Design a protein with these regions (language model features):
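A short SAM/SAH-binding and catalytic strip from SAM-dependent methyltransferases
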Residues: 120-133
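Conserved class I S-adenosyl-L-methionine
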Residues: 44-55
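A short, conserved alpha-helix within the catalytic core of class I
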Residues: 130-142
């Protein structure tokens, strides 16, 4: 993973300190997720994940390496175009990086998911910073996911995100829901005390 981070940092001319901080946050979040839900890594490993709102795609590279998993990314067209430019730059530098299917159209993503055996869903902030109609369109994808990892702030506009996630728990009847605050990131830059990590894991029957 450190090699991926160093290559990413080289692409953006980031300092070693920034890269180390980024890796530390990623590692702490994965460690906390696995503490909360011991089945989380088993269900993530070697299967496909969807990341909603991956931004520039750095975390997706780490998820892919850490869990040996194939990634599918969903984002706004302008962000997807920018990310594609970055990935091409990484390729020109002959850096080792994972390739992802990228979608900006929900219907196309939905058709792809229907053909996928087992999926996982990840979103750090972006999903609960989306309108309710967007969230609702993803319900069947969430319901069919082995694991769901969402980091969320407390509110988006007038929407109470934590109440939304509690309601999602009631609707995802085949999943176990565990959540915690982000105190494990207390020393990280930009630490947000009021934000939360939510994990949903499909029950084994």
């Amino acid at each position: 993973m450190s090699m991926v981070a160093l290559e990413w940092g080289d692409c953006f001319n980031e300092t070693k300190e920034v890269i180390e901080s980024w890796l530390s946050i990623f590692g702490a979040t994965m460690e906390r997720a696995e503490q909360l839900a011991p089945d989380f890594p088993k269900k993530m490993r070697s299967y496909e994940f969807i990341e909603f709102g991956p931004g520039l795609g750095g975390a997706a590279q780490l998820y892919s390496r850490y869990y040996n998993a194939r990634g599918t990314l969903f984002d706004l067209p302008e962000v997807t175009n920018l990310r594609s430019i970055i990935y091409r730059a990484l390729s020109r530098k002959k850096n080792t990086h994972a390739s992802f299917e990228q979608f900006t159209n929900f219907d196309e993503l939905s058709q792809k998911v229907k053909k996928t055996n087992k999926i996982n869903f990840i979103s750090t902030w972006a999903f609960t910073e989306s309108p309710m109609e967007v969230r609702e369109s993803f319900f069947e994808i969430l319901n069919s996911s082995q694991t769901i990892m969402i980091i969320s702030n407390a509110k988006f506009g007038e929407i109470d995100n934590f109440a939304y996630l509690k309601n999602l728990e009631q609707r995802l009847q085949h999943h176990i829901h565990i959540s915690c605050d982000l105190s494990y990131l207390e020393k990280a830059p930009g630490y947000q005390k009021s934000h939360q990590l939510h994990i949903f894991v499909q029950k084994d029957y």
